[in-house]
Amino acid sequence: MKILLTNDDGVHSPGLAALIKKVSEVAEVVVVAPDREQSAVSHALTLHHPLRAARIRANVFSVEGTPTDCVNLGIHSLLSYRPDLVISGVNRGANIADDVTYSGTVAAALEATLMGIPAIAVSLVTRSAGEHFEAAAACAAKLAVTVHQKGLPRDTYLNVNVPDLPAESLLPPLITCQGKRSYEGTIVDKVDPRGRNYYWIGTTDLSFEDIPGTDYHAVSRGHVSISPLHIDLTNHASIETLKSWELP
């Protein structure tokens, strides 16, 4: 099995180091990851300047670009073969509920899925530096073997969130659906020494609806959450209702 690894925390992040260590035990690994942190860039592509890549050691490439750039460049240029699987992570911080739409980690898995390659995004549920990246990476390695053996449904990729706990304390994985975040929309408005306004977003504490069966419900109780995500964003249940509208 040959696996391409990437992330959005950067090529030197502890989560990626843990993933390299654990996944290398079950597969041949090549890393193509951003040269710096690219958190919350979602599915962005670099289109207005050239990408640059550097081999920093054997089978590890650093790219001046986004996670989606890394998947594209890895599969279409840097690798001499088509990987069996792409794993993105281990992200420092949860990627659950509506936050998956912002995530560069999840978007890298989406990009691989668009190319027809099975993919897994894996994140460590922590609001600090994170301690148990290796436990999360071990979960990803085990799941990689299962996915390689069984395959994934068409246009589907897996979003895995692992509580920041020692491996022996983790509860069994649960298959979950995407949860719902409660948004407060607080903006921090400041004035710099030259009298100009500047702003910080994303500074409030995160809160989520505690709904059984969701990713948040699982990880908040110590379970590993595995959510199958789909490329098709259509709300199929609403189509017939919208067809009944008198459209202009």
UniProtKB/Swiss-Prot annotation:
Cofactor notes: Binds 1 divalent metal cation per subunit.
- Give the GO molecular function terms: 3'-nucleotidase activity; 5'-nucleotidase activity; exopolyphosphatase activity; metal ion binding; nucleotide binding
Q: What is its EC number?
A: 3.1.3.5
Give residues annotated as binding a divalent metal cation. Answer: 8-9, 39, 91
- Protein's cellular compartments: Cytoplasm
Q: Which Pfam families match?
A: SurE
Which terms in the GO cellular component ontology are assigned? cytoplasm
Which superkingdom heads the taxonomic lineage of this protein's source? Bacteria
For the keyword Hydrolase, the answer is yes
What this protein catalyses is:
a ribonucleoside 5'-phosphate + H2O = a ribonucleoside + phosphate
Cofactors per UniProt?
A: a divalent metal cation
Q: What are the entry keywords?
A: Cytoplasm, Hydrolase, Metal-binding, Nucleotide-binding
Which PANTHER family does the annotation name? Answer: 5'-NUCLEOTIDASE SURE (PTHR30457), 5'_3'-NUCLEOTIDASE SURE (PTHR30457:SF12)
Query: Per its database record, what is this protein's job?
Result: Nucleotidase that shows phosphatase activity on nucleoside 5'-monophosphates.
> According to its UniProt record, which protein family does this protein belong to?
Belongs to the SurE nucleotidase family.
UniProt-recorded name of the protein: 5'-nucleotidase SurE
What species was this sequence derived from?
Answer: Geobacter sp. (strain M21)
Gene name linked to the record: surE
